[in-house]
């Protein structure tokens, strides 16, 4: 049996010996002629089905579609002997993509395998509506993945900032995208400097300015970094930032440059840079492929040049600009965004010092106005006595401050500290002394209990740290030391202004387990303070932010087992969250630590089931992003179709030649008739 297959695909075929399908062929044809006639009839039907007229209606539906067809043909032929029958199976599959898109878009057409062509090489062909990967050139030459940054079929040409007004909101994204600058000099001779106080870059024209790109997790393959200038003020934001006509038309800085002369931002030292101008909004930007940091570094450095002064007439004309740096996928989805102000001037150090001095003077002036007040003194005459109102001065103790906290445990701990400090102001001195005496007694009892437990504990038991925490929770809280008379006296009307503003977090605090254990059965629970709950922030979800193996083992008290994991390349807890006891034993972890680590993995699983990972949580904002890569969001209609055709042709010799193959139907009928007569 010989198999005639295409060069790039093989499929093992086992013919079914129990085929009971007969094709009646004319008796005056030989078996070869019958086979040829049958095959031709099948191919005729197939050619009609594969003709362009069949899909013409679908193509007309998409007006001006771009189509790509990837055919796969597999032929299996059972070669006959001299006088034998044949069996032929033909399988064809066409992967068709039809898209309603602009014909100038170099991203389409291209092949799509829809996940069915494993191991097949994909090609991107420009200007062709239907190609086949099984031509002679493809078979003879070794196929290598083309560079995604090669000209002219670059994938960056399809990316463009769709919004008319790009967003300037910082968005770290799922990869914690960040942009930073090196330590810069403030001397007048410096070619560039960055002010962290003003979040502003000062640089000279056409001078190299290194910008450091950092991500916590590697972005997808083919990610790019885009830099785009926009005007800062609302009255200018709709205009496109370009170079002034003087610098654009002059030969200086333009001869021998790949970048268009109108682009403000250029990239130095990167041959893969792509300069893009949006055909709709006209905004100009420059794209470079993301490169991971080199060994021993945390940053990826991109060298930018700014090719026009901020004071140039006909260009920026002293209007402030912002530089928006985004991390994007190959199809334009924004993975992170950072923004900073830029000023291109002749003396960056001098301008930075002047701006910082000006902002400091303004802050001092604002603080002085807020302290002295701007209203006139109120005068009131009563019985001939002139009264002047006292000016209110804000006390530093009444100032409201907000502290962002990461982690539920830290938040609850700081909440208790805040509650205790505020309640301390209303406790009498003898109550405080009684509390301190009880605290010392509890501390001595805790030390004795901990000493006895350490002498009885065995290896592998992680209960001592937990028991220690439980003992700490059983300590009496400050709220229990207040008698009912003092507690009823704590009302919003008797508290100072600063105290009443900070109390809402106390009003939402529920008694802990340790607080309820300190109460007697007959003693009622202390009523909570009736304060409106107007907390300005929502606590973060109970999910561990540090997911490294080091911190995981440190929490379990098993830091000595770190080498067993790092030698196997295990660095995060997500790599071992599905491990079993057998897997831990295979890592040769000592038995005394194995149970503690297994219990920690189970706790992590339970926590993981009821919370979302931090890299999947996004803060909603009004930031607009570019296209998310879906053709639906771009207003395009895409139809992906896969057509399978299975055709089996079985040919037998004519009836006159059946006697040669012991397949005489007349003799079989006579034999069956004789058996029937003998049975009667």
Curated annotation (Swiss-Prot):
Chief place where the protein resides? nucleus
A GO term (biological process) for this protein? keratinocyte proliferation
A molecular function GO annotation:
chromatin binding
Q: In which tissues is it expressed?
A: Widely expressed, notably in thymus, prostate, placenta, and skeletal muscle, although the precise isoform varies according to tissue type. Progenitor cell layers of skin, breast and prostate express high levels of DeltaN-type isoforms.
Q: Which GO terms describe its cellular component?
A: chromatin; cytoplasm; dendrite; nucleoplasm; nucleus; protein-containing complex
DNA-binding region in chain numbering: 170-362
Compositionally biased, Basic and acidic residues: which spans? Answer: 351-360
Q: How is the cofactor bound?
A: Binds 1 zinc ion per subunit.
The segment annotated Transcription activation runs over 1-107
**Know anything about its domains from the record?**
The transactivation inhibitory domain (TID) can interact with, and inhibit the activity of the N-terminal transcriptional activation domain of TA*-type isoforms.
The protein, known as:
Tumor protein 63
The record lists the organism as Rattus norvegicus (Rat)
């Amino acid at each position: 049996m010989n198999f005639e297959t295409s060069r790039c695909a093989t499929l093992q075929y086992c013919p079914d010996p129990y085929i009971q399908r007969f094709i009646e062929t004319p008796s005056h044809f030989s078996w070869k002629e019958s086979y040829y006639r049958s095959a031709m009839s099948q191919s005729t039907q197939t050619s009609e089905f594969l003709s362009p007229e069949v899909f013409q209606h679908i193509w007309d539906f998409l007006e001006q579609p771009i189509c790509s067809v990837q055919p796969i043909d597999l032929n299996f032929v059972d070669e006959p002997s001299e006088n034998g029958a044949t069996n032929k199976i033909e399988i064809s599959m066409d992967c068709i993509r039809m898209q309603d898109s602009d014909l100038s878009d170099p991203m389409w057409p291209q092949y799509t395998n829809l996940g069915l062509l494993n191991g097949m090489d994909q090609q991107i062909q420009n200007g062709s509506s239907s190609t086949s990967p099984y031509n002679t050139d493809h078979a003879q030459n070794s196929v290598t993945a083309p560079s995604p940054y090669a000209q002219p079929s670059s994938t960056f040409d399809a990316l463009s900032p769709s919004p008319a007004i790009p967003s300037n909101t910082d968005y770290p994204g799922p990869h914690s995208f960040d942009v930073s600058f090196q330590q810069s000099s403030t001397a007048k001779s410096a070619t560039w400097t960055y002010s962290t106080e003003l979040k502003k870059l000062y640089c000279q024209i056409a001078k190299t300015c290194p910008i450091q790109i950092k991500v916590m997790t590697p972005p997808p393959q083919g990610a790019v970094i885009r830099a785009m200038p926009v005007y800062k003020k609302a009255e200018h934001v709709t205009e496109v930032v370009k170079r002034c006509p003087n610098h654009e038309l002059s030969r200086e800085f333009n001869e021998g440059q790949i970048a268009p002369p109108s682009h403000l931002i250029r990239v130095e030292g990167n041959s893969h840079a792509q300069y893009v101008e949006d055909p709709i909004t006209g905004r100009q930007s420059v794209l470079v492929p993301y490169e991971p940091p080199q060994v021993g570094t945390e940053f990826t450095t991109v060298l930018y040049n700014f090719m026009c002064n901020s004071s140039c007439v006909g260009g920026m004309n002293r209007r402030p600009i912002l530089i928006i740096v985004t991390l994007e996928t190959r199809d334009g989805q924004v993975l992170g965004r950072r923004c900073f102000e830029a000023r291109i001037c002749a003396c960056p150090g001098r301008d930075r010092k002047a701006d910082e001095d000006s902002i400091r003077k303004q802050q001092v002036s604002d603080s002085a106005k807020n302290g002295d007040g701007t209203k006139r003194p109120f005068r009131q005459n009563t019985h001939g006595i002139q009264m002047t109102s006292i000016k209110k001065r804000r006390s530093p103790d009444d100032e409201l401050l907000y502290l962002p906290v990461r982690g539920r445990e830290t938040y609850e701990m700081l909440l208790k500290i805040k509650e205790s400090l505020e309640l301390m102001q209303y406790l009498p001195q003898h109550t405080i002394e009684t509390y301190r005496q009880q605290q010392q007694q509890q501390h001595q009892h805790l030390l004795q209990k901990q000493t006895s437990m350490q002498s009885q504990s065995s290896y592998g038991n992680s209960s001592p740290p937990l028991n220690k925490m439980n003992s700490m929770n059983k300590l009496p809280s400050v709220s229990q030391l207040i008698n009912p008379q003092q507690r009823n006296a704590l009302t919003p009307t008797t508290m100072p202004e600063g105290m009443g503003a900070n109390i809402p977090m106390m009003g939402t605090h529920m008694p802990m387990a340790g607080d309820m254990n300190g109460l007697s059965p007959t003693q009622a629970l202390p009523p909570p303070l009736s304060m409106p709950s107007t907390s300005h922030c929502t606590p973060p979800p109970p999910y561990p932010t540090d997911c490294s193996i080091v911190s995981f083992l440190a929490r379990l008290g098993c830091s000595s087992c770190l080498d067993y994991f790092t030698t196997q390349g295990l660095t995060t807890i997500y790599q071992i969250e599905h491990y079993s006891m057998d897997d831990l034993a295979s890592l040769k972890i000592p038995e005394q630590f194995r149970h503690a680590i297994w219990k920690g993995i189970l706790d992590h699983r339970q926590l993981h089931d009821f919370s979302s990972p931090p890299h999947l949580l996004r803060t909603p904002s009004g930031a607009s992003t570019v296209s998310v890569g879906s053709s639906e969001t771009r207003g395009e209609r895409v139809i992906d179709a896969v057509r399978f055709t299975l055709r089996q042709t079985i040919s037998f010799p004519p009836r006159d030649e059946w006697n040669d193959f012991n397949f005489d139907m007349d003799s079989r009928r006579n034999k069956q008739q004789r058996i029937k007569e003998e049975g009667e």
